Structure formats: C-alpha cells, structure tokens
Amino acid sequence: MVKLRPKQCGRKQRTYRIVAIESQSRQEGKVIKEVEFYNPRREETQLDILAITTLCGSGVKLTETVCNIFRRATFKIT
C-alpha cells in the first residue's frame, strides 16, 4: 500500500517533504514521488496540487499528519 507521509530533511532545523512511499519501507526509503515541502518553523508549505489529486485518485492513503498539514494549508481532499 502506498501512503503520503512526511520525510525528514535537515538535522538541526527540520523541514519535511511530503512523499508518496510504500507503507512498509523505512522513512528514508525509496520515494515514488515528492508532492510537497513543509517547514513547521515558518508554517510554510509548497503544494503540487495536480500531483496530490492524481495520487489520491489512484488510491494513495494519507497519514494523519499529512491530513493535518493539508487542513492548515486550507486544502480539502474529498
């Protein structure tokens, strides 16, 4: 099963990339597609809405953390 989940970047000042990745692989595992950049310190997000909608249409599941990030970015998923 493929999921959208955050992948950590940086050591001291953490930022995250929201990636499509196999659910059983490690957090640093092979990425299928990167769809978002999220910086929690600045509350900054960069979305690739077309990629997100196509992935969700193909059956990709969202983790709870990613749903919360999308809500904060005022992006609704049906």
UniProtKB/Swiss-Prot annotation:
Coiled-coil regions listed in the entry: none
Keyword list, A-Z: Chloroplast, Plastid, Ribonucleoprotein, Ribosomal protein
NCBIfam families: S16
GO cellular component, one term: ribosome
Organism taxonomic ancestry: Eukaryota, Viridiplantae, Streptophyta, Embryophyta, Tracheophyta
Major place of residence: plastid
Residues that span the membrane, as ranges: none
Keyword Oxidoreductase: no
GO terms, biological process: translation
Protein name as annotated: Small ribosomal subunit protein bS16c
InterPro entries referenced in this protein's UniProt entry, alphabetically: Ribosomal_bS16, Ribosomal_bS16_dom_sf
Family the entry assigns: Belongs to the bacterial ribosomal protein bS16 family.
Localisation: Plastid, Chloroplast
Gene Ontology molecular function: any one: structural constituent of ribosome
SUPFAM superfamilies recorded: Ribosomal protein S16 (SSF54565)
